[in-house]
């Protein structure tokens, strides 16, 4: 199997000067030029924001963009002091998971998929939007539709990937809504672990105890968690398999 999930133009390399105002990061390129890049990840990015760390950015030539550069990856050291590249663009997670679904890499858990739709309204008030709504193939024994919520996961402690890394009211609401879909539908929470050094996944109780409680309640009700791990490179991302819960 070709484990390259996505390929793209080689990213531009530099070092992080600072991240500020949540959405912005100043980066010094190899040429010596300093540019400001958009940071799509507005969270605290625990364990990642080391000034002077190697980073990678993409460039857009769209005239509609205020900032042509987007911060995509940062290099950190794992527990063995080896370099690990981490994908920090939260908007990229859904692209990865859509590719994973389309390649049938989750079929042993969710079955064969007939159709994939994105951003479909759901919930009691229909004011929320699910990341992916899937219909099963007619050959599937389980005929239930599948709702998938995706969470970008970058925080690691002791080789355990953790989400969230801060209190997330939105994430709590998503767990409640996923639980309410059971048993009529299949509820799936995909943890998109955008680094290769995770061996397990667990909810980030230290950052958000309520989220951890809701996660376990939803799990007991039948929600399916799928921690998907990836390896990030300068011009592609590789599939690194599904990690167990801790």
Curated annotation (Swiss-Prot):
Transmembrane segments: none annotated. It comes from the Bacteria. GO terms for molecular function: DNA binding. CDD domains: SfsA-like_bacterial (cd22359). PANTHER family: SUGAR FERMENTATION STIMULATION PROTEIN A. Belongs to the SfsA family. This is Sugar fermentation stimulation protein homolog. The gene is sfsA.
């Amino acid at each position: 199997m070709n484990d390259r999930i996505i390929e793209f133009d080689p990213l531009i390399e530099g070092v992080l000067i600072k991240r500020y105002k949540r959405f912005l990061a100043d980066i010094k390129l190899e040429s010596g030029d300093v540019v400001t890049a958009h940071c799509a990840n507005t969270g605290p990015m625990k364990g990642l924001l080391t000034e002077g760390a190697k980073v990678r950015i993409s460039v857009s030539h769209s005239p509609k963009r205020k900032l042509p550069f987007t911060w995509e990856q940062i290099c950190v050291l794992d527990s063995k002091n080896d370099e690990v590249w981490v994908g920090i663009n939260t908007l990229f997670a859904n692209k990865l998971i859509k590719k994973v679904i389309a390649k049938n890499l989750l079929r042993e858990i969710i079955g064969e998929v007939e159709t994939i739709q994105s951003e479909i309204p759901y919930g009691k008030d229909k004011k929320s939007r699910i990341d992916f709504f899937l219909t099963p193939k007619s050959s599937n024994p389980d005929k239930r539709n599948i709702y998938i919520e995706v969470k970008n996961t970058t925080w690691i402690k002791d080789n355990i990937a953790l989400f969230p890394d801060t209190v997330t009211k939105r994430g709590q609401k998503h767990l409640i809504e996923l639980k309410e879909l059971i048993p009529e539908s299949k509820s799936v929470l995909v943890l998109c672990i955008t680094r290769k050094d995770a061996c397990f996944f667990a909810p980030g109780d230290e950052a958000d105890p309520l989220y951890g409680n809701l996660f376990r309640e939803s799990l007991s009700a039948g929600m399916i968690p799928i921690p998907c791990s990836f390896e990030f490179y300068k011009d592609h991302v590789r599939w690194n398999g599904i990690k167990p819960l801790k």
